Amino acid sequence: MTRFSSLLASALLLLLPVASAGAAAPAALFEAKTVADRDSTLTALEAAPTDPASAYAAGAGQFFTALEILAGGLHRHGFESPQSFILPLMRLPVPDNPNPEPLTYDGFRAILVAFRDRLEKSAATLGSVPADADIGMEVDLTRLGIDLNEDGQIAPDESAAAIMASLSRGGAPDPAGPALTFRFDRADGYWLQGYAEFLMAQADFWLAHDFS
């Protein structure tokens, strides 16, 4: 797997089955099929900030939902995702929208503000995890995803594996293929926090300009 795919895997890290996060977390997050189910468990994890594993998972989930906010906003108004090589994690394969809503200047800014604010929350949550926290989480990238088209569902073609396949070769993963399981630790949390702050700076750049 390419370095880019590995980085994307880190960025799309969903809230994983961790013993201290509670027994309900694996079913609600790792196997979440709807945004409502995932968000319900994310809210519960956010309410347990003193637990390092819960904070780590919540911070990753907040980053994950920031990407979803951006993808949903682009899809709602019929835009393609930015193709800049400088921002690979913003190059989400947003589905075509045959009935896009008109986009106003204020609406464009609102998407950026929501994206930026969610990233800020993610960076702060990840930063709260102690440096010596012993965290090891495993995830199958074929079983997690984000809602790219705002239909409230997390479909197989919206999985991390499908997104990575689309970005790397314009294809789709083999449904009968093996699981794509990765293990993430505290060091990956530092990287994710840094990338959240980098993307925040990009959003701030756009928000600092008046294009009306």
Per-region residue spans from a language model:
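Positively charged n-region of N-terminal signal peptides that target proteins for export
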Residues: 1-5
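Alpha-helical structural motif
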Residues: 7-8, 118
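Sec/Tat signal peptide C-region and signal peptidase I cleavage site
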Residues: 19-23
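Short coil/linker segments at helix-helix boundaries
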Residues: 24-42, 63-212
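Residue-level recognition of tetratricopeptide repeat
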Residues: 51-54
